Structures are given as structure tokens and as C-alpha cells.
């Protein structure tokens, strides 16, 4: 992870992210938006940065960290849900993280909702680490836990930017204000995402 390799990693992430929808919310206006809620199971996930067939970096910038590093205002964070299970902890009640996600959204001027997949739930048939759905996907839907999270956050009426990390097509089944498909963007993925959200660079994937 020398300086040169990190620069290449950042450039790859910047050039690969795809802006699928923008109702005018992007780039985010820092003079108007003072609080951002970063919500979702992929917000702090390094697995959502790595993908498959990856090397190991000495430092990963998650989506949450990238936004925190770039944004001078207040950043709220809520995990919202497990990537695909109905609870984050085995001893918790089902859906126990949705309430904090809704509260974070209600107290923000805009929401960055980080959903999608990672290599633990999509991959080749026979992958030993894949306990969700190994091999070809049966459909393009997100896991139910994330579909419920999206619905609850959207119901707050706050502007929502969905950031979908996945190595394949995904149907988010909603109408957000903006939608970014970021693939598995690598160790500098969080930095690249923040640059796009705030207009430092234009998405070109």
C-alpha cells in the first residue's frame, strides 16, 4: 500500500462509480446541508470495498469515513440492519436497528443510504464463505432486511441518496433522489464516494 498504489486505487474507484439517477440533489450543497445521516450495513464495511479476488491493503477508507473526512458539518451514523439477517446480534430482537436509522434520518438534512451486497452473499457456487446464496442469484432483489430499511428511511421524507455496492446488478425497488452503483471500489472507495457526493469530481463509470 505505497503512496503510488493508493493513488491508483483511488483513481480506479473514482472512474468506476456509476451515477444512475440524480434529481438535482448532487452535488451536495454544503451551504444548505449541515447534517448528513450515513445509514446502512455497508457504511462501515470493508468487505463491501474488497469484493472477490482482492489483495489486502494496510488501510481501508469506508463510505462513512470518506464522508466524515470530507464533510465539515455533522455526520450521524446508524447501521440500520444486518446485511441479510433479520437481526445484527443473535440475542437481539428482529429488526432492532431500524428505529435508530429512522431517528438519524429524521434529524438529518440528507441521507446517504449504503446498501448492497458483498462477497459473503454473492459469489461462485461452492464458495465456503457464502452462507446466503452461493452461485447464480435467483433474482435481483436486495436481502429483505435491507428492503425494509430502505422503505422505513424513505418514509421519513428526507432526501435520500442510495449508494449500492455490489459486483452485479441490483434492483433497489425504490425512487431515491439519487442512486449510485459503486461496485466493490477498493481501499479508497470511501474517499472516491465523498468526492462524487460533494462535486469534487464527476462520476464517470
Positions of predicted regions on the chain:
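C-terminal non-catalytic regions of proteins with extracellular/luminal or membrane-system context
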Residues: 3, 7-205
Amino acid at each position: 500500500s505505497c503512496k503510488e498504489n493508493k493513488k491508483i486505487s483511488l483513481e480506479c474507484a473514482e472512474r468506476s462509480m456509476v451515477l444512475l439517477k440524480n434529481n438535482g440533489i448532487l452535488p451536495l450543497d454544503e451551504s444548505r446541508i449541515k447534517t448528513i445521516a450515513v445509514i446502512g450495513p455497508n457504511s462501515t464495511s470493508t468487505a463491501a470495498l474488497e469484493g472477490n479476488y482482492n489483495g489486502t491493503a494496510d488501510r481501508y477508507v469506508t463510505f462513512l469515513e470518506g464522508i466524515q473526512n470530507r464533510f465539515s458539518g455533522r455526520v450521524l451514523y446508524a447501521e440500520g440492519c444486518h446485511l441479510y439477517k433479520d437481526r445484527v446480534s443473535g440475542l437481539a430482537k428482529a429488526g432492532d436497528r431500524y428505529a435508530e436509522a429512522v431517528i438519524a434520518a429524521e434529524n438529518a438534512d440528507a441521507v446517504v443510504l449504503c446498501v448492497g451486497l458483498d462477497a459473503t452473499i454473492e459469489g461462485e457456487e461452492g464458495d465456503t464463505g457464502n452462507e446466503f446464496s452461493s452461485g447464480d442469484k435467483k433474482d435481483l432483489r436486495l436481502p429483505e432486511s435491507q428492503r425494509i430499511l430502505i422503505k422505513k428511511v424513505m418514509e421519513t421524507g428526507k432526501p435520500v441518496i442510495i449508494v449500492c455496492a455490489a459486483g452485479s446488478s441490483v434492483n433497489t425497488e425504490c425512487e431515491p433522489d439519487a442512486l449510485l452503483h459503486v461496485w466493490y471500489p477498493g481501499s479508497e472507495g470511501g474517499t472516491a464516494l465523498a468526492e462524487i457526493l460533494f462535486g469534487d469530481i464527476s462520476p464517470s463509470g
